[in-house]
């Protein structure tokens, strides 16, 4: 896989100085070479007030570890996770060691413990949450005829980040993310052309 050997280049180091948002995941960090490059890139990104560094947990098979997840959560300021991944992370990090904590409590704890600007929790047909230090936004999942769920999570994240970069409130960015993800699920393929009503939002 190409992402198993991402080298550090002068172009990459220069790009790190210019980005307003960057998204990374756990799978591309399965090789030491790419993991080191990703870490160096993230450490080079200037920590401006509006810079978004998004960690999409994106657990796949056995290609993750406590160390990779811990370091990634330390480096990000926005965390994207789904309900199944939250169970795994919660167990791995002992976030529900006394039992009884619900998903929302665990998410609020992650926001607090890692100093996050936002945490996105997607729950499939059961809706989605966005948590920040100041607020909590819930939105139900729209009912659509599902053609293909590939790309649903990525489109959600991309739309949410795009909204924040354009000055949307957390709630407005959340609404855009939900609408975009629902549309993607109704289309074949991971990258359908978005309709004008979404592009104009």
Q: Residue locations for each model-derived region?
A:
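Conserved phosphate-binding/catalytic loop of the ribokinase/pfkB sugar-kinase fold
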Residues: 1-36
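Distinct, well-ordered alpha-helical segments
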Residues: 35, 63-72
């Amino acid at each position: 896989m190409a992402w198993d050997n991402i080298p550090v280049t002068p172009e990459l180091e220069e790009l790190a100085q210019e980005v307003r948002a960057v998204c990374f995941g756990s799978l591309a960090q399965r090789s030491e070479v790419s993991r080191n490059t990703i870490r160096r890139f993230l450490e080079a990104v200037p920590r401006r007030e509006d810079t978004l560094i998004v960690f999409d947990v994106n657990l796949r098979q056995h290609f993750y570890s406590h160390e990779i997840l811990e370091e990634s959560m330390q480096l990000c300021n926005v965390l994207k996770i789904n309900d199944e991944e939250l169970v795994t992370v919660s167990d791995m990090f002992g976030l529900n060691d006394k039992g009884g904590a619900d998903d929302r409590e665990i998410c609020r704890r992650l926001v607090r413990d890692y100093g996050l600007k936002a945490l996105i929790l997607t729950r499939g047909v059961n809706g989605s949450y966005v948590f920040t230090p100041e607020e909590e936004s819930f939105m139900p999942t729209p009912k659509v005829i599902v053609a293909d769920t590939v790309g649903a999570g990525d489109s959600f994240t991309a739309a949410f980040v795009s909204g924040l970069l354009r000055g949307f409130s957390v709630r407005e960015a959340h609404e855009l993310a939900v609408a975009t993800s629902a549309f993607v699920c109704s289309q074949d393929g991971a990258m359908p052309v978005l309709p004008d009503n979404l592009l104009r939002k």
